[in-house]
């Protein structure tokens, strides 16, 4: 099968996963047919392919466009039959299950394909009952048929299925912000410079569309639009927490408490009530899939780096004193926490990130020199650190955060810190 020319590279990779599953499903059908023809002959069946694909991304990341393109491209494939496109937001779990079941039962092709947009709309009930009803009444029977591939879009990653047969046959794939080469392709029919567009939008598809419509936008105007768009419908206090949380690559409730509360106030809230309030707001952000808990980091992070950077920049441009204050508090907090060698891998990047930001208003080269000096001063105190893990997170962790750090401290100092980590790794292995 040829690759669709109007899909960007990262989306082509996702499209290929669907094509591979279709091909594998067809091979299984052929193996079954061969077994039916000659029951005495042992036929080796291929590994069962995924039958449920969930493509998830932030608001405006191009989920519906991706589904429409998949439908258009696969409609030319005579080996499969596309049964329909459902918008889950227009149904209850019961009516969606019935509609899909009725359509599937009427068809007889070997390999069927159904597309479902806004699958996360079935998660409006925090108990998940609607989604699990849909799982048991529609997804499980479809997967057990072995002849239907389900392609769904969602604003959140969905993988906590109750049924084992669903869990083992599903895959989640994120629609990430576009890389610079994809931005160039996105802007082919415009006169907009791709590097400038990357700076303004951080590669978010919705923001790129808006930038094409408003090519004279400044960073401040784009960030203000993003803040309004991504935080639409949030209560004022949750919006404030989100704006401050966006300043952190990763965050936990303890650092949020430090930056959200004035601990010098005489009439502080009851600690339990305060922590409960923060937890409630963070839970709302996770339900809206603005943030998610990162098990490896042991902290929360934004699900979309472009969204985080756009909101953070809006805070920097509109509340600069507060932005600097938060980075100063965070730098002190993470440097203190990083004294615990056991958690260095989880804390090192945040320590550098906030230290660099806290010094960013000073002369050129100062942030990088200060960060390098901190690492040199601390390295002999990090006895027994897992340097391989620290180096791995530093070099291969969050690309967007690494990009920000390089912009803050310069590639020269980034390389020097990398060299120090590598030297410590080598020494620890001797």
Question: Positions of the model-derived regions?
Answer:
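N-terminal pre-P-loop "Q-motif" helix
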Residues: 6-22
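Walker A/P-loop nucleotide-binding motif
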Residues: 49-67
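Conserved catalytic segments around the Walker B and adjacent sensor/switch elements
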Residues: 52-54, 75-91
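Alpha-helical sensor/transducer elements of the RecA-like P-loop NTPase core
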Residues: 65, 120, 130-196, 200-210, ...
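Short glycine-rich substrate-engagement loop in P-loop NTPases that contacts/grips substrate
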Residues: 85-104
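Conserved P-loop NTPase "ATPase switch" module shared by AAA+ and STAND
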Residues: 107-133
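A eukaryote-biased feature capturing mid-to-C-terminal, repeat/solenoid-rich segments of large proteins
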Residues: 220, 231-233, 311-348, 362-402
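C-terminal boundary/linker of central alpha/beta nucleotide-binding cores
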Residues: 227-317
């Amino acid at each position: 099968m040829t690759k669709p020319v109007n899909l960007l590279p990262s989306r082509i990779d996702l499209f290929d996963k669907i094509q591979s599953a279709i091909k594998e499903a067809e091979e299984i059908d052929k193996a079954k047919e061969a077994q039916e023809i000659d029951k005495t002959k042992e036929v080796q069946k291929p590994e069962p392919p995924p039958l449920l694909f969930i493509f998830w991304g932030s608001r405006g990341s191009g989920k519906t466009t991706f589904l429409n393109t998949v439908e258009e491209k696969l409609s030319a494939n005579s080996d499969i039959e596309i049964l329909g496109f459902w918008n889950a937001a227009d149904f209850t779990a019961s009516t969606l299950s019935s509609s899909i079941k009725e359509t599937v039962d009427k068809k007889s092709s070997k390999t069927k394909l159904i597309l479902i947009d806004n699958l996360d709309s079935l998660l409006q009930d925090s108990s998940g009952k609607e989604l699990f009803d849909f799982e048991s009444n529609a997804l499980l029977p479809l997967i057990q048929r072995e002849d239907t591939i389900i392609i769904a879009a969602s604003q959140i990653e969905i993988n906590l299925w109750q049924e084992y047969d669903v869990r083992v046959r599903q895959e989640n794939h994120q629609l990430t912000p576009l890389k610079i080469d994809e931005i160039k392709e996105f802007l082919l029919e415009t006169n907009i410079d791709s590097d400038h567009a990357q700076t303004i939008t951080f590669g978010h598809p919705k923001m790129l569309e808006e930038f094409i419509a408003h090519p004279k936008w400044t960073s401040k105007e784009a960030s203000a639009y993003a803040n309004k768009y991504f935080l639409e419908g949030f209560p004022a206090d949750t919006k404030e927490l989100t704006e401050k949380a966006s300043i952190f690559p990763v965050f936990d409730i303890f650092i949020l408490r430090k930056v959200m509360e004035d601990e010098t106030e005489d009439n502080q809230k009851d600690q339990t009530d305060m922590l409960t309030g923060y937890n409630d707001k963070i839970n709302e952000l996770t339900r809206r899939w603005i943030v998610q808990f990162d098990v490896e980091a042991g902290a929360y992070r934004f699900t979309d780096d472009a969204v985080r950077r756009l909101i953070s920049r809006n805070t920097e441009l509109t509340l600069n004193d507060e932005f600097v204050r938060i980075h100063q508090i965070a730098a002190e907090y993470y440097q203190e926490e990083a004294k615990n060698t056991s958690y260095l891998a989880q804390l090192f990047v945040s320590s550098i990130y906030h230290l660099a930001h806290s010094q960013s208003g000073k002369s050129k080269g100062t942030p990088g020199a200060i960060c390098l000096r901190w690492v040199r001063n601390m390295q002999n105190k990090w006895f027994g650190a897992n340097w391989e893990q620290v180096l791995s997170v530093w070099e291969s962790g969050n690309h967007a955060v690494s990009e920000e750090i390089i912009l803050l401290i310069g590639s020269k100092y980034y390389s020097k810190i990398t060299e120090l980590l590598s030297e410590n790794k080598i020494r620890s292995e001797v």
